[in-house]
Structures are given as C-alpha cells and as structure tokens.
Amino acid sequence: MNSKIEDMSNFFDLRAKSYDTHMKKNVDNFNVFYKRVSKPIIKTNKKVNILDLGCGTGLELKNIFKKCPNAQIDCLDLSKEMLEVLKEKYKDRQSQIKTITASYLDYSFKEQKYDYILSVMSFHHILHKTKLNLYISIFKALNPDGLYIEGEYVVNQTKESRLYKEYLKVKEEKNIEIDGTFHIDIPFSIKTQKQLFDETGFKTFQLHYHENEAAVYSVKK
C-alpha cells in the first residue's frame, strides 16, 4: 500500500476530468459491470426516487435512465469537480438530477425516503464500524421494500486481512484518523459484506455480478 495518502475530496477533484477514462481502464469488464448495477432496478415509466452515494461523474446514471426515464435522482459526492462533470454530461436531465456536495459520512438521510439507494466503487475506503453505521442510515432512508444496490471493489478474505493490516500501519505512521477521510483502499470480501448486511437488518442478498475484484449485489429492506 502506498504510504502517500491524499485527502479524499482533493484526490477526486484533481482527477475529475480523467476519471471516466481511468475507470474504463481499471474496472473489469467496465460496460458489463455498470450495466449490472442497474439490473435490480425495475423498468418503469413512473417516477422513482433514487439516491446515488459517492456518485462521482455519474457513470451509472446512463443505464438507470434507460430503465427509469422519469427517475428523480439525488447525486451526492464530496468532490465539487466530479459533480460539475456529472452535470455537464447529463445537462439534458437537469430537472431530474439534484447534486449534493457532501460526504455520505456526514450527510443527514432524514429529508426523504427513496425507492433505491446505490453506491458504485465508493465504499471501499471505510472500515467495518463506519460502514455498518452508514448501512443503518441507508436502511432507514429506504421506503418499505426499497432496494440498496452496491457495485464495489471486493477481494478474498486473505487480501482483505492483509490490506487492513497495511491500513493500520499507515494510520500508525501518520498518527491521524484516516477512516473515510483519506483516499486509501480497505476493500472487503463478499462474505464480510453479507455479514454487515445481516447486522443491519437487510434481507434477500443477491449477487448480480462478480468478475475478479468487481462485484454488484443488492439487498432489500
């Protein structure tokens, strides 16, 4: 693990314009992966309310609008530059998209209930307890029978343990709290993810895609 770590918002602000190209090169079967993110969403012309956490430049929105052309989507990200790229890409959908510049670790989920909440390649920078608390907030923000969808960087349990130990080493060396505030990878295994969802109270775990270290799964409230 690279001991040089960067503040999360600065990291993504600096890379906003090149982010899409980077993801296309680094996500296994990029097009298939992002198409699978929208797979659990039911096709409808009705208005559905969706919250996209750590939305970045909105790579997942294209396929979502194909299935739900009248969706209202709240797009939350701590990088203002990422959101600017998103708004330019989807300027013809500006009446359907609300951008929120904030960290999902500090965001209040109390204002609205959602039919779907999703996160894509965003939650692998936070630890078990922090992620559990975030899942609890997500659970509460969903409508009855609402669905949470996650497309994520996943690893086997051996690599999960190794990267966690490396994280602890960096934390000790830097003598700072870096959980969720700095760009450092702490990915989990699918087994750990299932345990977290069980602890939260989610049900009906479904694995929609798993290729190398990229996976898409969903759970129901």
Locate the predicted segments by residue.
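Hydrophobic beta-strand segment of the Class I
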Residues: I117-L118
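Helix-to-beta-strand junctions that scaffold the AdoMet/dcAdoMet cofactor pocket
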Residues: I126-H128, L142-N143
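Core SAM-dependent methyltransferase catalytic element
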Residues: T200-K221
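C-terminal alpha-helical "lid/dimerization" subdomain adjacent to the S-adenosyl-L-methionine
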Residues: G151-T200, Q206-L207
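Short catalytic micro-motifs in class I SAM-dependent methyltransferases
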Residues: M121-S122
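Conserved class I S-adenosyl-L-methionine
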Residues: M1-T44, N63
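Class I SAM-dependent methyltransferase SAM/SAH-binding core
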Residues: L51-L53, G58-D106
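A short glycine-rich, Lys/Arg-flanked "PGG" loop and its adjoining helix->strand segment in the class I
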Residues: N133-P144
